[in-house]
């Protein structure tokens, strides 16, 4: 980690001051940094070395610049991106709040009104992105930030670039790296190269299921078992785990989780 930080500090010395590590996932390490040009704090996300090698700077910039054009109150905007010290990075506003994953870890299943409000914000963000032809491909609680009563979706453009760079033959590895098996649509899990906005609808359904029940749609001892379940198994009814969930809401979530994309909302 220190080697990476040293390389970043040296390469970005005139643009950012790296303050501390905020967290690390399968795809990137996130640092709190100070934007020297604009005197503001940002979240600087640095892709893992192997993903940087697989992507290449040109493809990364192409995909992330498409996403950078998105402007919406529920989309965390892209502020900057580039290559530094042989590493690919992008910067977003630093959100004083928590991720949806952090809230789930602390509280488990959320109240129905909170769940509906969060989902409405996420769907508003996705509607805007989809209207511009941008598919997220990696909707999950880690990529939903909570600020006050509002939810913001992060990391548009990154998942598409990574999944295309890693290729179909390494989809399972890519899925693990992205941390998405629990939210992958069947067509993603099956390595279908022709994905569209309906993979995001499925992922929202998977997130909604977890918000309402406190557990993922499918669980398994390996990522491959979870991916297989998305393709072949029917989800348990939400009301099996939480009887008080309105039936209309349960029906909506289950329709989002339809195996066939044409059957989703």
Where are these predicted regions, by residue range?
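C-terminal lobe helix-coil module of Hanks-type protein kinase domains
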Residues: 34, 120, 126-127, 131, ...
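Hydrophobic/aromatic scaffold residues of ePK-like serine/threonine protein kinase catalytic domains
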Residues: 69, 118-119
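Activation-segment/catalytic-loop signature of the eukaryotic protein kinase fold
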Residues: 81
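Conserved short submotifs of the Hanks-type protein kinase catalytic core
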Residues: 85-99, 103
